[in-house]
Swiss-Prot record:
Organism: Beijerinckia indica subsp. indica (strain ATCC 9039 / DSM 1715 / NCIMB 8712)
Name the record gives this protein: Diaminopimelate epimerase
Similarity comment text for this entry: Belongs to the diaminopimelate epimerase family.
Quaternary organization: Homodimer.
Protein's cellular compartments: Cytoplasm
GO cellular component, one term: cytosol
GO BP terms in the entry: lysine biosynthetic process via diaminopimelate
Role description: Catalyzes the stereoinversion of LL-2,6-diaminopimelate (L,L-DAP) to meso-diaminopimelate (meso-DAP), a precursor of L-lysine and an essential component of the bacterial peptidoglycan.
Enzyme class at the top of the EC tree: isomerase
Alphabetical list of PANTHER family matching this protein: DIAMINOPIMELATE EPIMERASE (PTHR31689:SF0), DIAMINOPIMELATE EPIMERASE, CHLOROPLASTIC (PTHR31689)
One Pfam family this sequence matches: DAP_epimerase
Regions that span the bilayer: none
């Protein structure tokens, strides 16, 4: 029988971004891509991201998180999922202002409880160097990258936006395209092409953004390994940063995604990006042993 059989998982969402939290602290278990995919087949457990908690690597941290997409691939960051993990670990601590530190492969994330269902997360500093994003080769300016190059057929999106895409790493690689008309861009057609663009050796998250005003941006996101999602916290962070770099937005703005709004602030004092938004608890259940039968046969 799989070591994951009958273990409890918590299903949550952050602005509709489907999250499953699995606490494996104290077990030494590291799940495989196939096991992550199997969990997503459980009743009601289809996820955009699976947040797996392990023993912390650093003193003062509550947990080390491995983050899986629904296809079993690993993600470097998930802002909505991090808020859900913070809610899970601070569930019995009703103090407003309660804090905890979480770790990922991309670094430490400080979480702050603002209300029972609202948290902020310090997502760290954005990276802009071509090899930090990463890109397949150097480019003159990561804030204006021509993604039309190397594509035999251009996806249905504003050509000017495609030729001036902004690259940001917020734990994950992000490409942000600013368009005047969201409805003119079919994300289901644009997202897969750009996610697998030859410039992105690790694939990329694709953000299609419209700046309504300096403090309001409308955004839809194609996540690598997950597809179109109702919300993506790291993409919201990357989009605000890209908008500031383009001179289109203030350093704090409301980012409106299909699932709702996030508040993103890029602090001038230390360059850290702070994401604030809600979480919603759905249910807790046990993992059905039958999910893993094909994997241990």
């Amino acid at each position: 029988m799989s070591a994951l059989a009958n273990r409890f998982v918590t299903k949550m969402n952050g602005l509709g971004n489907a999250i499953v939290v699995l606490d494996l602290r104290g077990t030494g278990i590291v799940i495989s891509a196939a096991e992550a995919r199997a969990i997503g087949q459980g009743k009601g457990l289809h996820f955009d991201q699976l947040m797996v908690l392990h023993d912390p690597l650093s003193p003062g941290s509550a947990a080390f998180m491995r983050i899986y997409n629904i296809d079993g691939s690993l993600a470097g960051a998930c802002g909505n999922g991090t808020r859900c993990v913070a809610w899970t670990l601070l569930r019995e601590d009703h103090r407003i202002g309660a804090e905890l530190m979480l770790e990922t492969a991309a670094g430490q994330l400080a979480c702050l409880k603002l209300a029972e269902d609202r948290f902020s997360v310090d997502m760290g500093k954005p990276a802009f160097a071509w090899d930090a994003i990463p890109l397949a080769h150097p480019v003159p300016d990561t804030n204006a990258v021509d993604l039309a190059r190397d594509l035999a057929v251009l996806p249905p999106v504003d050509p000017d936006a495609l030729r001036k895409a902004s690259m940001v790493n917020m734990g994950n690689p992000h490409a942000v395209l600013f368009v005047a008309d969201q409805d003119a861009c079919d994300l289901a057609l644009v997202g897969p092409v750009l996610e697998h663009h030859p410039l992105f050796p690790d694939r990329a998250n694709i953000s299609i953004a419209t700046v309504v005003s300096p403090d309001h941006i409308v955004l839809k996101v194609w996540e690598r390994g997950a597809g179109a999602t109702l919300a993506c916290g790291s993409a919201a962070c990357a989009t605000l940063v890209a908008a500031v770099r383009h001179g289109l937005a203030a350093r704090e703005a409301r980012i409106s995604l299909p699932g709702g709004d996030l508040t993103i602030a890029w602090r001038a004092a230390d360059d850290h990006v702070i994401m604030t938004g809600p979480v919603t608890f759905e249910f807790t259940t046990r993992l059905d042993p039958s999910l893993f039968q094909a994997l241990v046969a």
